[in-house]
């Protein structure tokens, strides 16, 4: 039911593992080719125990269930830090409890199971890992992994009988009936020759059949002590002494990042850009102090030496913070991940200096593929992770981390290299990975509800105004098929030269790689396609023949939207004439946007190719041209693309006349007109046009300073971030929360200081006047606000307008006048070039559909995709990136980084620690794979909802496989429960009971259940292991 996890019985766990492996060559969703095989001869020792890799899952969501531990092992985890247990083992936790959007926050800390159930999960995993090692990585040197027990939170609780039973059974389970039961179950399975033959294990028959008797009864020799934030020093020391003296366990004690002190922690977070993370100074007052820790650790190290045991520290615990995000319940939340790294590694440096590198350190605090090599090379080991495994790629990030470590020369290091650690601690304060800006704030999203089926989507495509086939053309570039890539681009994009330079690349703000490292440089790849593919593409290109039966089309305006419309329609055989009042085509791109942003020859390239399709251009046309006149000239369709070429300006008191409007200024600048602006120019506004004006003004002779004045803050600024950064690079200065009021003849510009109030209808906080003013000495002022369409001209043309003065159009841009369309900025105001092309595309698609013409044919590029190859990229982070100057290396890199999400998404599968979401291939759907949710495995942590690009929650909205009737009854999820020959099905809060035969076939399926029943049948026939028993 909902957040109640149902453990898998041991025998059923083995069935699940082997049946999935036989059916899919995967185990818990990890493909066989991505099972990690440790490098022979490289091991690490932790207090006398040997493990084949120094990495593993931290005590947390990845070590709570048996299947989580199995999955960790499959992907390279060999130091398994089991989830913390405590005497209070029946707490009810509010959900969701994880927010891993960037730095991670959580509101849970110990296992959600009772002590008995937790121990049982660890025992199942203990047996399963021994079996998997014998199957896939047999060795004469014994097991390659270490189980490390994690207990908390006070000595009184630890001494209670249930905790004592748990600890004792972890140390020696020989007398526990469960151990004998699981050994007998495993022995029975391995004595079955049919089972061994079915899985190709006959050659290992002898060693496998001897395995059950060899499995040790002691699961742990070490413990990691976890204490609550604010635990008194004497209590921490008492628990450590108890573990060393009474239990004889090698001990790590987990310490808090608060050891650095409030001022230092606050300083580090602020310097790294995480100033919004709220801290309570009094929390630091209650925590262990550094001087107390040093004294305590010295005593405990001496005690451990006396007892011939190991003792060290686990660095670090999470950081307690104020819950100010509103994403999780409660007043406090606990931070981990990359924001914790500079804190934890500096704690490690402080302690290592104090103990001259002789204090063993188990590490977990922002470890990832980007930091793990540096951590390991200091001599710190083991290294465990939780936050990084909650991101897309999931457990596969463990394998990627291990590949980073394989080439290290620090495997034999038996102490901490203090000098090296000091350097790393200093670097951690400035390295890109630890700075907040490393991960953009944009959330990858598809602004539609999560569908029940066929949910694989490339967010880059959905974010694109023209729905460019981005994954496909990137794959073609990676195969050096440049002309094919360009052909595919041209299917939807009439202006690749222009959009390769000045596209707002919404695709990059919605690239799945943002959850790994950085977005693909998609816009630059488009440039490469044109550069490398143009010659071959042009050679095989043929001018459209045209057709006498196609209706003539008139397009008013030869800017980006008009050019795109002409291209799409001429390509389909329509005779097209573009009517332009200027002496050239290109509109704002040609005449307004400064040429330092895009070379004129590239603009002309796109114009010339449109003309090559047979589009006619008539320049110098009368601005009084009307729809009626064009209709009278036998143009069946009329498209109006006149743009927004009017500035509203700004009303100022004062008598200074040196005020220019942005569009006339930029037009004169592009013409090369000698402009006299003086030394200091102020630009009012903060859109892209304002950025162009400020950058252009700085290039005018005599101008020494350009300042942008904006009445809101940087966060509300409408300019693209890229345009803002380029303006900064050019030397443009910015004054936010300032609004001009008066401009006097002596050059005094009076600015009203503003503050931010409540959000407006667009979500931007409204500027509110204060009583404060400031003045600047200014020579010229340029207003870059309020670009709008010329409503008088539109009225004169005969275009119907709505009550707000905008053209009255439908989704395709068609007006209330049949066959008359509005496209580009004139439709709804200033937008991007690619958005203008998008409006042209929608309008021309509507026309071509009316004419019974298919608008594009690119199916030939949608095949030949290997899901296994795509899946291979899922765990990898790009440590270093080549820039685009080396074109061949750049293309190879970006093609290898593309995750082709519309073919293999399964982010919800990746990020689920419990393996509660699965993807299976089901015939008969648009997507090759369908995603199912397994109710029994889910605790509703919310992590899959965080990373799903759709508006929805996979754990609530996907087809759910139920294992128990009570859980089906207590849920509202769409899904099904198989009960022998009956299947209970629920969809849209309506329920059915259907009959299913032994072959998985239904009779008399209601039409609305066709898709769901097709999936149920497929699961019944080919993935029956998903229907196995669970424990109540």
Swiss-Prot record:
Signal peptide: none annotated. PROSITE patterns: 4FE4S_FER_1, 4FE4S_FER_2. SUPFAM superfamilies: alpha-helical ferredoxin (SSF46548), FMN-linked oxidoreductases (SSF51395), Nucleotide-binding domain (SSF51971). [4Fe-4S] cluster binds at residues 938, 941, 944, 948. This is Putative oxidoreductase YgfK. One of its GO terms (molecular function) is oxidoreductase activity. Residues 928-958 form the 4Fe-4S ferredoxin-type domain. It comes from Escherichia coli O157:H7. Could be an iron-sulfur flavoprotein with NADPH:O(2) oxidoreductase activity. Its cofactor is [4Fe-4S] cluster. Binds 1 [4Fe-4S] cluster. Pfam families: Fer4_20, Pyr_redox_2. The gene is ygfK. Keywords: 4Fe-4S, Iron, Iron-sulfur, Metal-binding. InterPro entries: 4Fe4S_Fe-S-bd, 4Fe4S_Fe_S_CS, DPD_II, FAD/NAD-bd_sf, FAD/NAD-binding_dom, Helical_ferredxn, Se_rdtase_YgfK.
